[in-house]
Every structure is written in C-alpha cells, then in structure tokens.
Swiss-Prot record:
Pfam families: PRK. Keywords: ATP-binding, Cytoplasm, Kinase, Nucleotide-binding, Transferase. ATP binds at residues 12-19. This is Uridine kinase. It is found in: Cytoplasm. It catalyses: uridine + ATP = UMP + ADP + H(+); cytidine + ATP = CMP + ADP + H(+). Its main location: cytoplasm.
C-alpha cells in the first residue's frame, strides 16, 4: 500500500440498508485491500455508568459517538499504522474489553448513521454515500434486528423509535443527505447503484496507482 487509502463513507438512517450496501461493496474487493469500519464501534465508553443510566443514553444523537477516537484511528490508517478498533456490547450498552486489530488497507469503508454529520469526518472521505429508504421499511427492519440480535422487546423498540429514533433522524440524519455525493434509494436492493460505486472505486484506485 504505497498511496493514500481511499475512504468511502456510507451513511443513512437506521434500517436504511446502509450496512448491506457497505458489505456489498466490501465483497467486491480482495479482503487484503479493503476494510470495513462501523461507526457503531465508536459509541462512547459508558463503563462508569450503571446499566440503568446507560439505558437512558440517546444513541441516535451525535454526542453518543466518540468521533475524536474514530478520526484519530482514520489518521493512523492513512499514515500506514494499524489500529485497535473498539468492540461495542449492545446488551451491556458500553464498550467491551475486546479490541480488533485493523491493518491499513487501500480502501476504507466507513458505515454509520451519523458519518456525514461531522465535518471532520466528511473532509476525510473521497466518496460520500447516503442510503435513502422509506421510513416504514426502516422501522420494520430495526424492529427485527433489535429483537433478534440485541435482546430487545417489541415494546421497547417501538417506544425508542417514536420518542428518540424518528426525532433524531429528522433533526440530525436526514439533513446530512445534502452532503452526499451520491444518494442510493432502496438500500442494498439497488444493484445498479452498488455496481456503479464499485466501478468508480476501482477507477480511483487505478488512478492513484499511476500517480
């Protein structure tokens, strides 16, 4: 890896399909040349709080994320240095004691709801994507995910969506759509958009290789 890595930001509301889009792009490249980093891994450490206090945290607000650490890690990767990516425990609502060693790669894919909200992160991205999906579809996907994967009850998911997730989406996430270079409708179902992005990324890689 001789040239500066390419950073692709994939943002969008919860349940929009942004994770699917990010993974579909990821799978089109050799694993030795690409890495996927989730913004969720950079939720702030809340180990000093009780579980009851952690449950009151607004996880859809920009202040829930430790973007300072994420930016520090991105600069390290850009400079050819490995990082120790934190691992977030969704059931305990704080960071676990584990970390994942991430080596620098030619392509870095960032994925998260509020990636485009922080100007410092936007400035590091070569391509900014926003995955745009109907709100009804997003809430259904969130319900299924949180109940199956994160040990939540249906009642708690609905309450969180109406009181926190939807208001935060309208206030903080939806406005970041204007920063996107490309808006992808229908999330991971949009094969045309995903294939176009892969082609564009390959072109950027080839362009950097001859500079």
């Amino acid at each position: 890896m001789g040239k500066r890595p390419i950073i692709i930001g994939v943002a969008g509301g919860t349940g929009s399909g942004k994770t699917t889009v990010a993974k579909e792009i990821f799978y089109q490249f050799n694993e030795k040349s690409i890495v996927l980093i989730e913004q969720d891994a950079y939720y702030k450490d809340q180990s000093q709080l009780s579980l009851e206090e952690r449950l009151q945290t607004n996880y859809d607000h920009p202040l829930a994320f430790d973007n300072d650490l994420l930016i520090e890690h991105l600069h390290s990767l850009l400079n050819g240095q490995a990082i120790e990516k934190p691992v977030y425990d969704y059931k305990l609502h704080t960071r676990s004691n584990e970390v994942i060693l991430v080596e620098p790669k030619d392509v870095i894919i960032l994925e998260g709801i509020l990636l485009l909200e922080d100007e410092r992160l936007r400035e590091l991205m070569d391509i900014k994507l926003f995955v745009d999906t109907d709100a009804d579809i997003r809430i259904i996907r969130r319900m299924v995910r949180d109940i199956r994967e994160r040990g939540r009850t249906l009642e708690s998911v609905i309450e969180q969506y109406t009181k926190v997730v939807r208001p935060m989406h309208m206030q903080f996430i939806e406005p970041t759509k204007r920063y996107a270079d490309v808006i992808i409708p229908e999330g991971g179902q949009n094969r045309v958009a995903i294939d176009l992005m892969v082609t564009k990324i390959r072109a950027i890689i080839e362009e950097k290789a001859v500079l």
